[in-house]
Amino acid sequence: MLQFRRSARSLIVVLFITSAGFADSPARQPHVKGDLQTQDGLRILRVWGTPREQGFAQGYLLGEDGVKLLDKYLNAGGPDAIKAYEIASFLMTRTMKIEPCYQQEMEGIVAGFKARLGDKIVVPALGRPLEYRDLIAVNCIPETARVGCSSFTVWGPMTTDGGTLAGRNLDWYHNPALDDSQILVARVSEAGSPTASWVSLTWPCFVGCLTGMNAEGVTVSVHDAPGQRTTDGSRLTPRGLALRESLESARAATAGQDIAAVLRRRTCMVGNNIPVALPFVGKGYGSMVFEYDGDLEKDNGVTIRTVESDQANDCLQVCTNHYRKRADAMSCDRYENLEVDFARATKSGKKLDVAGAFAWLDDVAMSGNCMTYHSVVFEPNSRRMHIRLSHGKVDATHSKPIVIDVAALLRPAQ
């Protein structure tokens, strides 16, 4: 089982923001291209417009609690963590290549916070205001704080409706700063835009993708893998942003080609397994896994694992935290448990539904120093997500699912 690794030297702290009450009168509020709502306790932020306008909406609507949470997180780590954070924020700003559209969005977030908070944007632990480089540090957290996750996809004869059903757990080291602060962000593109609209289950100010679905039903999730680090430091892209660009580029009919093209032009620091699910329409398959790292001499950094190259089962694909094509496959109890679940279902003739998919995810939830922050079942054919969230120290496996109509969330704003 993948162990979470921390050190003061590599610590990058994520800025997590929860909603705050607004004291400004309507006459003083700027025009914001976004709205914030709550469904069954989950905050849902919809944004539209230019990248900067989308960023401004995030910063303005999410309120002042982000500064307090960042301060609390840094102080919990002590002076060494604060020093490491400052070093990391400078290094990542100079090392990482950020595409202009994402840079504009991050700058917009900072502008939105300034417009909302004024002098309250100062982070006491840092003794300075929140800046653009803090957004870079936030979006590089997955490069140094590795996560252990589990996913699977079934489709066709294994599902009750003949479509695709995909499950995903995000497991990470428990930190109180992450408790009860997850949000769903819906980024709505204009009709006809080459950039697909998509939703992201995440924490505020992380603009990359950890767990997402786009308007065509394509899903992407991040998983760690022990891959090769790149020797070309001039081309590094935060992997969350590479996954986001993949999802924004992917069309259901050509997802494999679309995602591979993005990943091969965005070199990352670390090894990744990227499970992708897509609507199953009676032929082909409903899943593929992209084994992705900085070894550009092997398949230009990306090896695609499909069912044909994975196992004899023709309607199941499993993904945890080890390669199966880019390197020799290693033993993994979570991987094997999901295969056992599939074998039992096949033997019994029982087709999998959402409740059954969550039961499989429960079987592979991590424990010990890690917890499951969210557990998600995707229905790509119908563009739905079923989301379970952690609450306090209680992980997501114990919560009631929240059903999200992704198609409705992503309709262009009027």
Short names for language-model regions:
Residues M1-L11:
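Bacterial N-terminal signal peptides that target proteins for export
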Residues S10-S19:
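Bacterial N-terminal signal peptides
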Residues S25-A115, P157-L165, N169-Q414:
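C-terminal, well-structured catalytic/ligand-binding subdomain of enzymes
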Residues I109-A111, A115-G167:
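Gly/Pro-rich turn-and-neighbor structural signature
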